[in-house]
Amino acid sequence: MSHEDCIFCKIIDGELPAAKVYEDAHVYAFLDISQVSKGHTLVIPKVHTKDVYDTPADVAGQLFSVVPTIANGIKKAFQPAGMNILINNEEAAGQEVFHTHIHLIPRYGTEDDGFKAKWETHNDDYTKDDLEDIAWKVAGSMTCTR
């Protein structure tokens, strides 16, 4: 997707409306139109990057540096019982708009708050050696971007 076709880039450029929550030189945050729960906010970099894999470390740092401020604003405004903070990367993980974005989803402790993430444990499937092998493969595959 090019910058010209990106709905989030159009929001940043003022071509499409959005309920803005926060803006600085590098980051823009606005309410998700779906409002999975009241206060559901998206935090995006102003520079177009497809997903976290495509995002330079400095841009990621700018993006994540404002998350606590926005999360605390949501907490103060609505007193949620908790909050999920997540990024969907690529279609298989649920990414629908291919511009890096962080979801801040307030949770109100009710079954109908709109978000249904649940992890199933597989700890019995992995030995200590399996975990060490997985960690070694991940660590050996990383490229330092600092």
For each predicted feature, which ranges?
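HIT superfamily nucleotide-processing domains
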Residues: M1-R146
